[in-house]
């Protein structure tokens, strides 16, 4: 159980990487841009991949009626997500410490993982809703008004995950370093659960 508890203490600490590294990355490539434009989405705001990328993206979006990219104060998520991550890191490592001291059993480990998974799904849903609003809620007075073949207004929603073609841009939307660190930490808590379960079964057979 002690080995499982050590894994449970360490696993949630990987989520601290979200305070340093981006969670998600969106890149836009086109022939007129030798170096693609990109944004890194952190839990506390959106930042350029290269200097002036946000400024250039906002400039392009202005012509087709899209909103400017939000600043941290424009979205409640950018103040709430760091708080949630901090709480989950504290609770996860506390559960691991209590497990090491024999105060809780291994089932608490998977409980933390399930709560974190639900929060992750909710976060992805919220992110997708923002992408929908960002790509479809266009300014009716935009300089360029493009329509689909059926006459409906064209959507500029970036993909939630993967690649897509938008006008002459190739757009990619993929997890970044922070997301992979979070995934690694969460998988460590799953391993901690099964390690603790195995130790419990071996102990009960003696």
Label the model's feature ranges.
Residues 119-131:
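Juxtamembrane membrane-interface segments at transmembrane alpha-helix termini
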Residues 3-28:
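N-terminal signal-anchor transmembrane alpha helix
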Residues 3-6, 74-77, 101-108, 167-177:
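Membrane-interfacial loop-to-transmembrane-helix junctions in polytopic alpha-helical membrane proteins
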Residues 10-14, 18, 77-97, 110-120, ...:
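Hydrophobic alpha-helical transmembrane segments
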Residues 20-78, 128-173:
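Long, glycine/tryptophan/cysteine-rich extracytoplasmic
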Residues 14, 172-199:
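A hydrophobic membrane-anchoring alpha-helix module
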Residues 2-6, 92-122, 189-206:
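Juxtamembrane interface at the cytosolic side of transmembrane helices
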Residues 64-71, 91-99:
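Membrane-helix exit/interface motif
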């Amino acid at each position: 159980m002690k080995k499982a508890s050590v894994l449970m203490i360490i696993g949630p600490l990987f989520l601290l990487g979200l305070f340093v590294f981006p969670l998600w990355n969106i890149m836009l490539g086109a022939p007129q841009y030798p170096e693609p434009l990109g944004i890194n989405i952190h839990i506390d705001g959106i930042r350029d991949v290269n200097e002036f990328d946000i400024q250039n993206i906002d400039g392009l979006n202005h012509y087709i009626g899209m909103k400017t990219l939000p600043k941290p104060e424009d979205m409640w998520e950018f103040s709430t997500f760091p708080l949630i991550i901090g709480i989950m890191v504290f609770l996860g490592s506390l559960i691991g410490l209590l497990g090491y001291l024999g105060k809780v059993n291994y089932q608490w480990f998977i409980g933390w993982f399930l709560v974190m998974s639900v929060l992750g799904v909710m976060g992805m849903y919220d992110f997708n809703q923002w992408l929908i609003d960002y790509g479809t809620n266009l300014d009716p007075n935009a300089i360029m008004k493009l329509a689909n073949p059926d006459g409906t207004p064209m959507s500029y929603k970036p993909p939630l995950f993967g690649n897509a073609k938008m006008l002459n841009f190739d757009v990619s939307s993929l997890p970044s370093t922070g997301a992979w660190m979070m995934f690694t930490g969460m998988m460590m808590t799953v391993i901690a659960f099964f390690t603790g379960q195995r130790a419990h079964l071996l102990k009960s057979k003696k």
